[in-house]
Swiss-Prot record:
Protein name: Leucine--tRNA ligase
GO BP annotations, alphabetical order: leucyl-tRNA aminoacylation
Binding-site positions, ATP: K648
Keyword presence, Disulfide bond: no
Keywords: Aminoacyl-tRNA synthetase, ATP-binding, Cytoplasm, Ligase, Nucleotide-binding, Protein biosynthesis
Gene name for this UniProt entry: leuS
Intervals of motif 'KMSKS' region: 645-649
Sequence similarity: Belongs to the class-I aminoacyl-tRNA synthetase family.
Species of provenance: Cereibacter sphaeroides (strain ATCC 17025 / ATH 2.4.3)
Catalyzed reactions per annotation: tRNA(Leu) + L-leucine + ATP = L-leucyl-tRNA(Leu) + AMP + diphosphate
Length: 873
């Protein structure tokens, strides 16, 4: 008997698929189409088990849909621009282009052995000039359509690397790479008008029925719709031109609890004061050393500077509130100015307590009296409270009712107007980096900002750049930077900022429909292939990537690059769980000198401190024991961290190439699909991989045995046909419902049924061929081997998906338990319509019943049709 040897067979079938062009996507109007797409990877150079799981999921769907008669598009590309390539060039020498394309080649070589049903003819990288040139063409179209504009904006500036940092790249107020204190600097930036679509993007979430509820909620919260009041305080002692201070509040019902007003350090009033007051200038400079994100401001100590300016309360002009510049107010939300109600906002409470400001409560819990507060009272808006300083609505009402009543009251009195605001800000895309898509505009002293002529696209990145000096190499590349104005022909300068890499990934799904087109999309191909029917990726992309893609589809539709039906580009979204693994580490305590800044007064500079040094170890260096783990080389006992996300830092990574080399691609695919529901994390274990390999070997041996079997039909043929029909129905349901683990569980069960069946040889071969078809999406190489062994025609990858005979799904057999003197002793399976007298004969012939009777006859034998048989001795 031959043995299961994936190393000898898997590459052969991959070559056969390539030769037959099995996975080439074909525009075929006579067939329904299905577009399945996994979020394309960043070319880091190595694939990991998370990639294996993600792309196997998409592959299972793509293969099953192709077998079911769909024309399938299942492409692959590379999200290839970005900082890591540029940082690699700085740290190791070389060029980002070489580093990126080298990594792409490495990852492609690692992915192909997985046997994915990808149409590699459509492959592209976002750093290909053919791709980013079309992106530049769309930029110009969107600029002319008013979807893009330029303005000054406050950004995180790294003074060492001389670049803008994203909020997440600012760690404890310092640049993630340079460790230099970050500055808030105002720069001219390019923006997409995504905020114009905030209401539409929010409202349309309700129509995305096949998206996870969690993702829709995360996007809704990010868009952040709020209903509030915008009004103006009149000012006292303010500079000329600042006689009013516009504020926006979502809690106008708390106006009578206001004890101060606060403005952003970037507010026009703060900027005016900064130019004329050294104290203000010093405070604003301190504020600018904090990142620009809400998270950074939330973590920072709340500080304020009393400007000496006062504002009059709109309902009591005798009451004047101090105006502070506060480090926690964002200029780009609302008006950049707020009033503080410390009794009902914890941040305002801490601020008022710090600066000795009044804390008058506006409402109290229902049934309680007004009392001094030790912390802010912040009930849910839906909770009923008693208003002690209310001015609109009932005395006892919910916060929601009170806000609506307050807006109506204020509007009736001419104090402001009700406004719907959104947390979503316009999307700033300017990056002071080399390795990105150049922004295709030219700055001319005569004509101003001029788009590059489309016939000159792509504006290619120059190759002759160096990274030995901080900052953007494009700024110091005169032969690239200096150009002529396409409008007047005068000397001009190119825009040296490049686009945020999120732009690259916001439309790649559309480019896959016609990746070689000389326009961003081909109308005919986009009409046929769009939308993406099934999108697969991690929950970490729930907000930015998916939200930007939804906006971009609208912008592309407005500029004629996508059909109206593609305004929501992804019909269904699935967010898969992670692949996890135990982590192993050893620790050692060492005595080291105390850092000088930590020494107590009078303490010796030679003072030592105990420092724990932790060393992580790769799984292949570790041997598991009954009570833990040891290091193979030394026997040292190790600490074990329960299964956690695979990461290079913890060294708990499993190299897919090692798994493929040891067990084959099908084992890796089977295991990551079988052990857990796909939306949950799956723990990778060596024992689990070995068990998967053993099962696939068992399937191989079973197929080999059945292929060589001989024998006439038997009475069990029909039962096996029924089991086959059920397997078809349940595996199909599992795949279509993204319950891959349930589909695989059914295949385990079907294997057991087939191995135990006493059916005839031809019935078994028929069932085994069906098994090959059913397991083909999960383990395509083994499926081809089994299909070939059993005489299947052509490739199983091209065979139509099996259909269950409805008649065989109707179970006309019933299993009746046999009770002897009230205790269950046996069972008998009979046709549902079998006569009771015939059932009695089968029961009396049962071995367990015969042993109990010891040659005698039962006192009673009662058959309850379809339910039970009672034997009384």
């Amino acid at each position: 008997m031959s043995r299961y040897d994936p190393a000898a067979t898997e590459s052969r079938w991959q070559a056969a698929w390539d030769e037959a062009g099995v996975f080439t996507a074909r525009h075929d109007p006579s067939r329904p189409k299905y577009y399945v797409l996994e979020m394309f990877p960043y070319p880091s150079g190595r694939i990991h088990m998370g990639h294996v799981r993600n792309y196997t999921m998409g592959d299972v769907v793509a293969r099953q849909k192709a077998a079911a008669g769909y024309s399938v598009l299942h492409p692959m590309g590379w999200d290839a621009f970005g900082m890591p390539a540029e940082n690699a060039a700085m740290e190791r020498g070389g060029h980002p282009k070489d580093w990126t394309y080298g990594n792409i080649a490495d990852m492609r070589a690692q992915m192909k052995p997985l046997g994915l049903s990808i149409d590699w003819s459509r492959e592209f990288a976002t750093c290909d000039p053919e791709y980013y040139g079309q992106q530049q063409a769309m930029f110009i179209d969107m600029l002319e359509a008013g979807l893009i504009y330029r303005k000054n904006a406050v950004v995180n500036w790294d003074p060492v690397d001389m670049t803008v940092l994203a909020n997440e790249q600012v760690i404890d107020g310092k640049g993630w790479r340079s460790n230099a204190p970050v500055e808030r600097r105002e720069l001219t930036q390019w923006f997409f008008r995504i905020s114009d679509y905030a209401g539409e993007l929010l409202e349309a979430l309700d129509r995305l029925k096949d998206w996870p509820e969690k993702v829709r909620l995360m996007q809704a919260n990010w868009i952040g719709q709020s209903r509030g009041l915008q009004f103006a305080f009149s000012t006292v002692n303010a500079p000329e031109g600042f006689d009013r201070l516009e504020v926006y509040t979502t809690r106008p019902d708390t106006l009578l609890g206001a004890s101060f007003a606060a403005i952003s350090p970037d507010h026009p009033l703060a900027k005016h004061l900064e130019r004329h007051d050294a104290g203000v200038a010093e405070f604003v400079a301190e504020c600018r050393r904090v990142g620009t994100s809400e998270e950074a401001l939330e973590k920072a100590e709340k500080k304020g500077f009393d400007t000496g300016i006062r504002v009059r309360h709109p309902f009591d002009t005798a009451l004047e509130l101090p105006v502070y510049i506060a480090n926690f107010i964002l200029m780009d939300y609302g008006t950049g100015a707020i009033f503080g109600c410390p009794a009902h906002d914890q941040r305002d409470f801490e601020f008022a307590s710090k600066y000795g400001l009044p804390i008058p409560p506006v409402f109290v819990a229902e049934g309680t009296e007004e009392a001094p507060l030790t912390e802010a009272f912040v009930p849910m808006k839906s909770e009923r409270v008693a208003y002690v300083r209310g001015f609109a609505g009932a005395e006892i009402q919910t916060g929601e009712e009170a806000v609506a009543a307050a807006i109506d009251f204020c509007e009736s009195k001419g104090v402001g107007r009700g406004v719907t605001n959104y947390r979503l800000r316009d999307w700033g895309i300017s990056r002071q980096r080399y390795w990105g898509c150049p922004i295709p505009v030219i700055h001319c002293e005569t004509c101003g900002v001029v788009p590059e002529a489309k016939e000159n696209l792509p504006v290619r990145l120059p190759d002759d750049v160096t990274f030995d000096v901080p900052g953007n190499p494009l700024d110091r590349h005169p032969t690239w930077r200096d150009c002529t104005c396409p409008k007047c022909g005068a000397k001009a300068r190119r825009e040296t900022d490049t686009m945020d890499t999120f732009v690259d990934s916001s439309w790649y799904y559309a480019r896959f429909t016609a990746p070689r087109a000389t326009t961003p999309t081909d109308p005919e191909e986009a009409e046929y292939w769009m939308n993406v029917d099934q999108y697969i990726g991690g929950i970490e992309h729930a907000i930015l990537h998916l939200l930007y893609s939804r906006f971009f589809a609208r912008a592309m539709q407005k500029t004629g690059h996508l059909p109206a039906k593609a305004i929501e580009p992804f019909n269904a979204l699935f967010t898969q769980g992670m692949v996890t693994h135990e982590a192993y580490y050893s620790e050692e305590a060492k005595q080291e000198p105390v850092w000088q800044g930590m020494l107590e007064p009078g303490e010796s500079p030679d003072t030592q401190m105990t420092v724990r040094h932790i060393t992580y170890h790769f799984p292949e260096e570790v041997e598991r024991t009954e009570d833990g783990a040891i290091l193979k080389t030394t026997g040292q006992k190790l600490k074990v961290i329960p299964s956690t996300k695979m990461s290079k830092s913890k060294k708990n990574v499993v190299d897919p190439m090692n798994i493929i080399s040891q067990f084959g691609a099908d084992t890796a695919r089977w295991f990551v699909m079988s052990d857990s529901p796909p939306e949950r994390d799956v723990e990778w274990t060596a024992s689990g991989a070995e068990a998967a390999f053993k099962h696939l070997g068992r399937v191989w041996r079973l197929a080999d045995e059945i292929a060589r079997a001989e024998g006439a039909p038997t009475a069990e043929d029909v039962a096996l046909d029924r089991a086959t029909a059920k397997a078809i129905a349940e595996v199909t349901q599992g795949i279509e419902g993204f319950a891959f683990n349930k589909a695989i569980a059914k295949l385990y069960e079907f294997t057991n049924t087939l191995s135990r069946s006493g059916a005839g040889a031809e019935a078994k071969r028929r069932a085994m061929r069906t098994m090959a078809q059913l397991m083909s999406p999960m383990v395509p190489h083994l499926a081809e081997e089994v299909w070939s062994m059993l005489g299947g025609e052509g490739l199983v990858a091209q065979a139509p998906w099996p259909k269950a005979d409805p008649a065989l799904l109707v179970d006309d057999m019933v299993t009746l338990p046999i009770q002897i003197n009230g205790k269950r002793r046996a069972e008998v399976t009979v046709p549902k319509d079998m006569a009771a007298s015939e059932v009695e004969k089968l029961v009396l012939a049962d071995e367990a019943v015969q042993r109990a009777l010891s040659g005698g006859a039962p006192k009673k034998l009662i058959v309850v049709p379809g339910r039970i048989v009672n034997v009384v001795i």
